[in-house]
Amino acid sequence: MSEERETVLITGASSGIGEALAWVFAEHGYDMILVARNAQKLDELADEVAAKHDVMVIVRPMDLSEPDSASNLARVLHREGERVDILVNNAGVLEHGAFIDIAPEDHQRMVQLNVAGFTNVLAHFVPDMVAREAGKVLNVASIGAFQPIPSLATYAATKAYVLSLSEALAEELRGSGVSVTALCPGVTQTHMVEEAQEQSEGVRKLPRMMIGDVETVAREAFRACMKGTPIVVPGTLNLAGTLAARATPKWLVRRLTGLMGRSTL
């Protein structure tokens, strides 16, 4: 990588918010290391980004739900002399539906990637940032992290973990030179949401105004990450809903999200 430019590592970079963030970071002159399972999409994205913005891009196809994947990634990058200045911890998977209708292996896959894989990436890259007294972390949670969501029960629970760990880590690292930002987007027009729309008539019927633009979300996330803002909720409606949920008794929030969740099944 270039000695003059900083490098961002983006997981889940082959589509959705991860891909959009790759374009935004490239616009601002960052070299990047892109990680995802789909090697073909990573290669295509890397070629397009490098050609348009004259940045250096490394691709590392891998499945971060595998227990040793984060350690293998860290070891390879260390051996190659690559420094990670900014970590975008975005890789995740979503399964929509009633809890009992989702296969046990799909619940496990969400926990393995959204919780275990997410944590392993942090554990292998944050210590080096702290040692250098410089770095930024952008963890991708969800607006679903703020309350339980029937029909997305396991997914929302994993994102609550992401938000909780992000907030705790932000405080632990206060004054260290390393900032931690939790991105909590609402429903965003990504491949993941498109799959949910295919599975659920209720999701398909969501008003267009409730579905965020992925590029807009990525730009808000970039700005918050640069500032070191602990939590960012893109979109006025999403932010208002989040603030309202935090001020509402939990039993009522559960009842309301239950009604909404059943309407999307």
Language-model regions, residue ranges each:
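C-terminal helical subdomain
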Residues: 182, 204-241
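Substrate-binding pocket helix/loop in short-chain dehydrogenase/reductase
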Residues: 98-99, 106-111
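Active-site helix of classical SDR
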Residues: 122, 158
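The beta1-alpha1 cofactor-binding region of Rossmann-like NAD(H)/NADP(H)-dependent oxidoreductases
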Residues: 39-40, 61-72, 104
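Conserved glycine-rich Rossmann-like NAD(P)H-binding loop of the short-chain dehydrogenase/reductase
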Residues: 28-45
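Residue(s) in the substrate-gating loop at a strand-loop-helix junction
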Residues: 142
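Conserved glycine-rich cofactor-binding loop
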Residues: 14-16
